[in-house]
Amino acid sequence: MVDAEFDRVAHDYETQHAAATRLSGEETEFFARYKVQDARHIAAAANCMPTRILDFGSGVGNSVAPLQGEFPTAELTCLDVSAASIDYSRHRNGDGPDYRTYDGHTLPDDLGLFDLVFTACVFHHIPADQHVGILRQLRTRLRPNGLLVLFEHNPWNPLTRHSVDSCPFDVNAVLIDGPEMRRRILAAGFAHCDLRYRLFFPRPLAALRPLERLLTALPLGAQYSLAAR
């Protein structure tokens, strides 16, 4: 994961993302909002009521407003390797969150502990041989009963493949399938990890989206979530 790679695209990220996801019929805000709503439902089902949240790989801050909306009383820390992305997020979202940068390898010692670590489509930008180590560090930053909620692109979905292949800032991305990502999470010391597939229907078929709750085990959704503790 190279900070300069995202420093170069920080101010054009949303335009590039919108172009890459146009086949879905949805705006960038939709993808951030659904993930955070899912995270809230997952946390509630796990009896986890976050007072401190880490947005790991927060980028240009697409998840900040949804996180503040769904968890209005929680303290939010945004952590990313790209200083330009963090600056853009601060300008866009204000000074409410604690904005931090790091070197892409070692989490800052003074981050503290969190009830929820949220990370959205970040690990496909991190070299695979670093995944377990970073996940292990994230685990050590969770409070008792804390929760990791991780979202990633599903490489088994052809539209996802097309979207990633056509996105300039994903040029060096290496997609990870759900079972493999789950193995890495467990290898990092998490005791339990729940895999669910999401985003089966594009906007023209949005009326069918209530059916998705019945399809979470079907490995054809455009993305997936992993909830671990």
Predicted regions and their residues:
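N-terminal, positively charged/glycine-rich alpha-helical extensions of SAM-dependent methyltransferases
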Residues: 1-20
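Class I SAM-dependent methyltransferase SAM/SAH-binding core
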Residues: 62-106
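A C-terminal cap/extension of S-adenosyl-L-methionine-dependent methyltransferases
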Residues: 99, 193-229
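Conserved alpha-helix/loop element of class I SAM-dependent methyltransferases that forms part
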Residues: 31-49
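Acceptor-substrate binding/catalytic loop of class I
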Residues: 164-180
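A conserved beta-strand element that flanks and buttresses the S-adenosyl-L-methionine
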Residues: 118
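A short glycine-rich, Lys/Arg-flanked "PGG" loop and its adjoining helix->strand segment in the class I
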Residues: 132-144
